[in-house]
């Protein structure tokens, strides 16, 4: 079924779905595509919109996707639905705000057996702040454990939305999906915009195709956009000619023009990876708009790690791969870095640990790169004794203790929603992570906890630990609050008396001895035995806090002596001893990749 172009603006509906991980968002999208005939039965793969292999394997949505469908309403009119899919994980909240900027409405999907989760609350507030019409939907209503009344009450108490007319659906069986589409058309307002004004289109997303160059997903706010139009990117002032324009149905389908209020893609032969920045405004070259659209708030990376190619010949390929991923993922930051231990690579900034894992996995899969990742660290502020304030995102560049007046660490505000029976375990975890409780509220049978926590304690394993102490029921949303002075020190690792810059950590002084001892022990297990003793030391400045030794392998040099004179044996042993001494002075120790990752495991409780 084709999509006709003659849709008037009053029949366009732009919407997205807000939901926590696993609440059935991608399955609802599949049902919409099925009912509106976007794909034939043969082409309907499960989770059509989660097109990345990685998304299907992990069962999460990483990249926002878009799809345009035709829906024949109960009044006989044909409506044009533009659905923009959004991720649900806390690391990808930036993608969500980007998707919502292109919509007039949102479906808040809540699992009827689990209830409201913190991430949905945060995204829902973002939608309400942006003036979207939010329609509450209860999914998985077919489950025996579904409690629609309790969940409706939670939506009203926690979010403050009227849930008396919440729609009850089961995306798996298809129950209630028709009613949901009808309610969507009735309750979400049509887009506002002026077809006669000069063109203004917002770039929601961009990605790179090796044959076509940059493909941009745009939302046309004013005017219209046709192939052969000459366009200008407002921030860079660069001119391009539109080669193709079209819609995702979810297959790519070309159209004669993108109308006011519509969402579609354009291909304009942009070969430069930075040619169409996300959040930018597209206008015509001749009749151009003077005022750009408000873009998205620039997002700051929270976690930094070094990425180094195992083979130094891959350095340029890594640079190219990062540039292409950066186009599609505005939250990724990178700059060149050199390490004495690992050679040339990049210092990369991420939104969180999941974001980091996914970028690393995409680089390895999509670009066939073999990488070493150093331990992730957060950004610290350092006040030097001269009164300068430095931003430190790499422990190896922290100034010497004598030059530091104070070190400030980033503090976050964490909102945790947890069922009452697990609240004790969650509070215990927050205390262990140096958290300060700010608020505790009872909401139905859930408890809302507000904590201030150091970001460095949260990035490594807080999310996994929170899930394990609450049997998977607690949910977390956090945002940066401020920098606060703390007693932090740099923990260095010395192997045979040499500092290995890639293994340095910034830790709280109270934990330094424990972390140092644990790190040294881990290294002892991972570093292969040599023909000489390898000393592993953990140090704070010049003060050694822990030491272990990888014992030497012993070669039996006296095996060929049968009985005979003891001096013959002694001579061979002395010769071996001298050889080992010389070897220890010049011999370098090969550190395996697992050793760099062991830093991540330090401080984790099994």
Swiss-Prot record:
PROSITE patterns: G_TR_1 (PS00301), G_TR_2 (PS51722). It catalyses: GTP + H2O = GDP + phosphate + H(+). GO terms for biological process: positive regulation of translation. The keyword Metal-binding does not apply. InterPro entries: EF-4, EFG_III/V, EFG_V-like, EFTu-like_2, G_TR_CS, LepA_C_sf, LepA_CTD, LepA_IV. Its EC number is 3.6.5.n1. Keywords: Cell inner membrane, Cell membrane, GTP-binding, Hydrolase, Membrane, Nucleotide-binding, Protein biosynthesis. GO terms for molecular function: GTP binding; GTPase activity; guanosine tetraphosphate binding; ribosome binding; translation elongation factor activity. Residues 10-192 form the tr-type G domain. GO terms for cellular component: plasma membrane. GTP binds at residues 22-27, 139-142. It holds the Pfam family GTP_EFTU_D2. It is found in: Cell inner membrane. SUPFAM superfamilies: EF-G C-terminal domain-like, P-loop containing nucleoside triphosphate hydrolases, Translation proteins. It is a peripheral membrane protein. Belongs to the TRAFAC class translation factor GTPase superfamily. Classic translation factor GTPase family. LepA subfamily. This is Elongation factor 4. The gene is lepA.
């Amino acid at each position: 079924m084709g999509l006709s172009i003659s849709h008037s603006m009053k029949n366009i509906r732009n919407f997205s779905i807000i939901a926590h991980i696993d609440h059935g968002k991608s399955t609802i999208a599949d049902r919409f595509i099925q009912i509106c005939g976007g794909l034939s039965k043969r082409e309907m793969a499960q989770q059509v919109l989660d097109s990345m292999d990685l998304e299907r394997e992990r069962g999460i949505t990483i990249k926002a996707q878009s799809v345009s469908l035709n829906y024949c309403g109960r009044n006989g009119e044909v409506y044009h639905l533009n659905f923009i899919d959004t991720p649900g994980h806390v690391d990808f909240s930036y993608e969500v705000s980007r998707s919502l900027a292109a919509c007039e409405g949102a479906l808040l999907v809540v699992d009827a057996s689990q209830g409201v989760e913190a991430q949905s609350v945060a995204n829902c507030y973002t939608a309400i702040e942006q003036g979207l019409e939010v329609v509450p939907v209860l999914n998985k209503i077919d489950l025996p454990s579904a409690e629609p009344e309790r969940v409706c009450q939670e939506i009203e108490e926690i979010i403050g939305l009227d849930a008396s007319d919440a729609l009850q659906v089961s995306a798996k069986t298809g129950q209630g999906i028709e009613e949901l589409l009808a309610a969507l058309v009735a309750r979400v307002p049509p887009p506002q915009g002026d077809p006669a004004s000069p063109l203004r289109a917002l770039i929601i997303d961009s990605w790179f195709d090796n044959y076509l160059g940059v493909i941009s997903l745009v939302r046309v706010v004013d005017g219209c956009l046709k192939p052969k139009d000459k366009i200008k990117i407002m921030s860079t002032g660069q001119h391009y000619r539109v080669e193709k324009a079209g819609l995702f149905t979810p297959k790519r389908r070309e159209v004669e023009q993108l109308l006011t209020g519509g969402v579609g893609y354009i291909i304009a032969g942009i070969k430069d990876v930075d040619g169409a920045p996300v959040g930018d405004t597209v206008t015509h070259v001749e009749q151009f708009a003077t005022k750009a659209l408000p873009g998205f708030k620039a997002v700051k990376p929270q976690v930094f790690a070094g990425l180094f190619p195992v083979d130094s010949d891959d350095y340029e390929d890594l640079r190219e791969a990062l540039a292409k991923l950066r186009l599609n993922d505005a939250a990724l930051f990178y700059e060149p870095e050199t390490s004495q231990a690992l050679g040339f690579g990049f210092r990369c900034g991420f939104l969180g640990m999941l974001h980091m894992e996914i970028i690393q996995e995409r680089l390895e899969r999509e670009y066939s790169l073999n990488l070493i990742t150093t331990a992730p660290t957060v950004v610290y502020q350092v006040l030097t004794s001269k009164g300068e304030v430095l931003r430190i995102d790499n422990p190896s560049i922290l100034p010497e203790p004598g030059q530091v007046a104070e070190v400030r660490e980033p503090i976050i505000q964490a909102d945790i929603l947890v069922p009452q029976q697990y609240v004790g375990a969650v509070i215990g975890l927050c205390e262990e992570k140096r958290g300060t409780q700010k608020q505790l509220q009872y909401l139905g049978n859930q408890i809302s906890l507000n904590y201030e926590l150091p970001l460095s304690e949260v990035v490594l394993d807080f999310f996994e630990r929170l899930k394990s102490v609450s049997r998977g029921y607690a949910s977390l949303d956090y945002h940066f609050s401020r920098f606060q002075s703390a007693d932090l020190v740099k923990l260095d690792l010395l192997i045979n008396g040499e500092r290995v810059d890639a293994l340095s950590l910034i830790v709280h002084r109270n934990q330094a001895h424990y972390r140092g001892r644990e790190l040294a022990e881990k290294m002892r297990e991972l570093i292969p035995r040599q023909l000489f003793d390898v000393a592993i030391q953990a140090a704070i400045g010049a003060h050694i806090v822990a030491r272990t030794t990888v014992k030497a392998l012993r070669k039996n040099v006296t095996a060929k002596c049968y009985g005979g004179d003891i001096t013959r044996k002694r001579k061979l042993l002395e010769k071996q001893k001298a050889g080992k001494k010389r070897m220890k002075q010049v011999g370098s120790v090969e550190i395996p990749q697992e050793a760099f990752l062991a830093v991540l495991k330090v401080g984790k409780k099994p």
